[in-house]
């Protein structure tokens, strides 16, 4: 990356890679997007590249889960909850899908800045 600043999609909470100490902030941000239990594993805390890889896998799994829920919502929820609740559920899943897509991009950008796995 150049001195022009971070690329579009870079997380606001993480300073650009040119900034001193950016990796420390990146590690905290990545941990925030992983299961809390990951904090207890020394390799995850000591190896930012491992953490970034795990965060990518985690976000991808969340995205797949949201897609799976979206595909099943009408069938599974419709008969008992009705069309209004199903529509609200689908809207929530659409919003979550958009959030996760943006998060996936941000995690990938941080991972690329940290270096190859």
Which residues does each PLM region occupy?
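Eukaryotic low-complexity, intrinsically disordered regulatory segments enriched in serine, proline
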Residues: 17-117
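Extracellular/periplasmic low-complexity linear segments
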Residues: 6, 10-14
């Amino acid at each position: 990356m150049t001195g022009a600043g971070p690329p579009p999609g870079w997380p606001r909470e993480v300073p650009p890679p040119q900034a001193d100490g950016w990796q420390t902030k990146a590690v905290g941000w990545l941990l925030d997007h992983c299961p809390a239990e990951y904090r207890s594993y020394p390799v995850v805390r000591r190896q930012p590249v491992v953490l970034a890889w795990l965060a990518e896998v985690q976000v991808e799994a969340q995205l797949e889960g949201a897609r799976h829920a979206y595909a099943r919502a009408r069938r599974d929820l419709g008969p008992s909850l009705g069309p209004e609740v199903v529509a609200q559920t689908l809207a929530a899943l659409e919003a979550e899908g958009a959030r996760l897509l943006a998060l996936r991009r941000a995690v990938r950008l941080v991972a690329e800045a940290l270096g190859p796995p």
